[in-house]
């Protein structure tokens, strides 16, 4: 069994020594599940479509985690393009690999204007997941619930650049994703 993570800066673990893909690898290795991370800093959904044959297909994942949104939002990828790219990735994964596809959102951003900008992308992820029967992991809502229950400030679990989670934030990502991944394994 193989899980492949394909995303941008967050999935690549920018700014931390162990990102959520590393934590998932540690969690699932004893079960014989391989976790491969083919994410790169700053990449958008356009990059994932363009490199599907090189980054995803050769690994033949059983589960594909497609984690884009924040880099797209701040790289001027239009919402319509983002949606089209996600649809293309899902269809390629199903046609060429028969892989289950997991679409996570990202964390809440503390700045209300930036949060509103990425919320459009999170809604798009929800639409694609519903339309194409993918597994969606609403990290942003789980994150909000976690912070509400435990009382940390909105910028808790984030690096100096609030678009990136810190090590503890990556732990939250891994926890939220594992709930869905456990059901697929």
For every predicted segment, state its role.
Residues 22-31, 49-185:
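Alpha-helical cap/lid subdomain in secreted, periplasmic
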Residues 1-41, 46, 51-60:
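Serine-esterase "nucleophile elbow" of acetyl-processing enzymes
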């Amino acid at each position: 069994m193989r899980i492949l993570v394909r995303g941008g800066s967050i999935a690549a673990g920018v700014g931390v020594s162990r990102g959520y893909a590393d934590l998932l690898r540690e969690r699932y290795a004893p079960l014989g599940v391989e976790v491969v991370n083919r994410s790169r800093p700053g990449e958008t959904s356009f990059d994932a479509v363009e490199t599907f044959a090189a980054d995803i297909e050769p690994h033949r994942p059983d589960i594909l985690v497609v984690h884009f949104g924040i880099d797209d939002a701040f790289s001027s990828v239009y919402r319509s393009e983002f949606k089209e790219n996600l649809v293309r990735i899902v269809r390629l994964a199903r046609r060429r690999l028969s892989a289950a596809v997991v679409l996570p959102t990202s964390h809440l951003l503390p700045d209300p204007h930036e949060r509103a900008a990425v919320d459009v992308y999170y809604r798009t992820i929800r639409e694609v997941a519903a339309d194409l029967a993918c597994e969606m992991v609403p990290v942003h809502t789980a994150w909000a619930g976690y912070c509400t229950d435990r009382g940390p400030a909105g910028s808790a679990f984030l690096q100096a650049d609030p678009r990136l989670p810190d090590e503890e934030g990556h732990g939250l990502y891994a926890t939220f994703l594992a709930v869905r991944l456990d059901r697929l394994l």
